[in-house]
Amino acid sequence: MPRRAASPALSENDFDITKSLFNDDIDGNDDDFGNTTTKNVEPLDANGILDLGLESDGDGDGAFISAQQAAANRKASNLKGQSVKKGGGFQAMGLNSHLLKAISRKGFNVPTPIQRKTIPLVLDNQDVVGMARTGSGKTAAFVIPMIEKLRAHSVRVGARALIMSPSRELALQTLKVVKEFGRGTDLKCVLLVGGDSLEEQFGFMAANPDIVIATPGRFLHLKVEMSLDLSSMKYVVFDEADRLFEMGFAAQLGEILHALPISRQTLLFSATLPKSLVEFARAGLQEPSLVRLDAESKVSPDLQSAFFSVKGAEKEGALLHILQDLVKMPTGLPENALNATDNFSKKRKRGPDGPTKKLKPTEHSTIIFAATKHHVDYLASLLRMSGFAVSHAYGSLDQTARNIQVEDFRTGKSNILVVTDVAARGIDIPVLANVINYDFPPQPKVFVHRVGRTARAGQRGWSYSLVRDTDAPYLLDLQLFLGRRLLLGRDCGDSPNYAEDVIVGALQRNEVESKSEWITKLLYDDDDLTALRNVAGKGEKLYVKTRNSASSESAKRAKEVVASKGWMELHPLFKDVTNGAEQARLEMLAKISGFRPNETVFEIGQKGKAAHSEAAEIMRHRREKIIPRRQKEEDEKAAAAAAAAEEDNFDSPAEENDDNDDLEVTVTGGDDDMAEASDGELEVTFSKAAQKGKGRTLSWKDSENFMSYTPKTINTAEERGYGVHSGSYNTASQNSNFVEAARGVTMDLTNDDGAKSFAEPSKAKGMRWDKKNSKYVARANDEDGSKGIKYIRGESGQKIAASFQSGRFDRWRKAHKVDRMPRTGEAEREGPASAGGVGRGFGTRYKHKQERAPKEADKYRDDYHVRKKRVAEAKENRVGSFKDGSGKSEIKSTEDIRKDRKLQERRKAKNARPSKKGKY
């Protein structure tokens, strides 16, 4: 019996050592296998086989197999003879071949740290909470394992994966990534966002999709309207989870989470996530794995930032100064827009000018973030009048218009995109060079998301921020959150580091003044632009009232920072364009702007007897009392600071770590930048500032046995900035202050029997007095926003908008003749009608069977000969009226005969003529 041929390796990780075992005497060729001859074949040693190799060296066999496997991994070859990439990247994660091809087609060679840490955990069916800085590949980290787990389209009705996004642009971008990685599979993916046709989305959900990418509001609308059953969901992703779990999406997420099955796998991803998962308790995480990468860097190391101190009335001029002198923004239409205009034609194009050509943004592409949509409209109009190519987008803009504006910026048809924070998260725009914060962000994590649009995937980028005096507390909060040094003016020296320091300075005075004057003239000439500016000013007043407040510590420090000399010094970016005379001019202007006269309004211009008036004497005596007291306080502060500095010089290093400033940081742990959250990870700890000038007292803390209520590894400023509930500093929901947190959880047992106490209003329980309408209104309406709006109770018991049950789905179902929607778990119908219900369901194709002959040709028409030819063809083919067959039946029925007789009798009675038979 001939020896069996060698089998090829089953997969990339398997290898064939048959040739080595048999000394390469077998080549595996089936044609020559029967003629194979053995050379120097030794007889089998039965004793050696029966001894089970006890006398042989097992380590030698293991070493031999390891050597063969290493050789196979070093260089393998596929069936075509081409070299295969080494394992260790995506190939080592056990992904299928179609997905690996899609990954390589996308251009991914090596997984990023967040992908390397999370993909194995997700494939192991674990709940994951992942945080990594912007541009690190978080979208692919949950899309790749999702496609690997779903594999193919399910014949059972019901979606299996849900991806929630806070904005429409982010959902659209996620859809593109899913389509790119899903090539080679038959998975169905739908996009459900606001602004699109609701009827079309009914059809999408009726087509039994596998993956649903949606925003919370529209998905809840479809769920309530269509009575969707979400029990088939196995894979749920919350992209930008900290934004989704804020109060704005509380009602929508509560209803959606209630409908999801408990056995689902839940993933949370964002660039800004707190270490504590208490705020995500509603997500239903089950023993999640927390992965926080680059927690200490927060922003890309390739990002360079500059902060400019400006006055409120000069912000528009400062913006033009940055665009023209720093960004070097060209005016007019970009080259891509000109090419698109010149090559416009209705004829379908192929090749390099066809629709497959991918246009890229220009090297001057800049995003400008504004506070409200009114600012966006005003700035977009102002920049267009300045000659720039501008696109704009905000939340309430029509969805089609938003897509057009963002796509124009993506393809390089415009250089500037003016947006609100709707585009601050997740939007990936390639080759984005600059980010400008026209309105300074009120939260540190919003700044992280804004500047994360640039310096992505190893590319360098710049961020410019305009900081008014009122924005200084938010700047200090950001500086504490990032853990960087704050340098004012020329304090940075000759070699400033814009990537690691927060450097604040002023813009060039003459440039800002000239551009501000030009804008003033433009506003004087254009009434429409003036109206837009007035509306933006009113919107800013409301925005300032409703934005989150800064921390009290930063508010106190901000007064000193703004009053310092370096606040209005020229920024180091302009050190090469200024000379000594310009610097002296700036110093003189700073002195003039900070000048405060000694005389009051009662004393200025008073001479002679008027100088000794009663009002002037009162102010003079008061000044004599206040000025020495103020000078004494300043001297005491200076002496206390000097004494504290002398004591610090004699302190040990261990004591210095306990008495650092608020600005100084203590770094503990190793420098592992890719570890899960643990007690030993790298954290930045801000120590409490000691009281200066009051003398040092012995601490009552026992260093060996004292236990603090806060872990040493907690960075207060960082956790406060990462807070989910809007990052607010003035709410008890923020656990940054133990006293505030304790006050928020206290339980009051007064009036527990429901009896009304003395002097309590009769309608005070659950009600409040509305001053505007002069009546009591429910306090619950203030919490959920249902002021004058009709609400219904959802399945979870929460109030949702009554407009979600408008009956539009029932009308759509009747219009498309869908008897009923298939239930979750039922088998999908085969054929074209599988998209709808039973019988003549949605998606059924109808074939027209009626045949009509062409009309007779008209000799006065231009196409007479063509029509004549068509008529001849119809006669030849016997189509329509020219078709052969039995003629019309002329046999009358009894009813026809009866009708004819009645008609004849009626005519006879009418004419009254005798019959011809009467003549004879």
Curated annotation (Swiss-Prot):
ATP-binding RNA helicase involved in the biogenesis of 60S ribosomal subunits and is required for the normal formation of 25S and 5.8S rRNAs. Residues 645-668 have a biased composition (Acidic residues). CDD domains: DEADc_DDX54 (cd17959), SF2_C_DEAD (cd18787). GO terms for molecular function: ATP binding; ATP hydrolysis activity; RNA binding; RNA helicase activity. Pfam families: DBP10CT, DEAD, Helicase_C. It catalyses: ATP + H2O = ADP + phosphate + H(+). It comes from the Eukaryota. Belongs to the DEAD box helicase family. DDX54/DBP10 subfamily. Residues 351-361, 623-638, 813-831, 851-878, 885-903 have a biased composition (Basic and acidic residues). Residues 339-503 form the Helicase C-terminal domain. Residues 119-291 form the Helicase ATP-binding domain. Its main location: nucleus. Transmembrane segments: none annotated. It is an enzyme of class 3 (hydrolase). Keywords: ATP-binding, Helicase, Hydrolase, Nucleotide-binding, Nucleus, Ribosome biogenesis, RNA-binding, rRNA processing. ATP binds at residues 132-139. GO terms for cellular component: nucleolus. GO terms for biological process: rRNA processing. It is found in: Nucleus, Nucleolus. The keyword RNA-binding applies. It comes from Sclerotinia sclerotiorum (strain ATCC 18683 / 1980 / Ss-1) (White mold). This is ATP-dependent RNA helicase dbp10. A motif (DEAD box) lies at residues 239-242. Residues 904-920 have a biased composition (Basic residues). Residues 337-361, 623-668, 749-770, 813-920 are annotated as: Disordered. Its EC number is 3.6.4.13. A motif (Q motif) lies at residues 88-116.
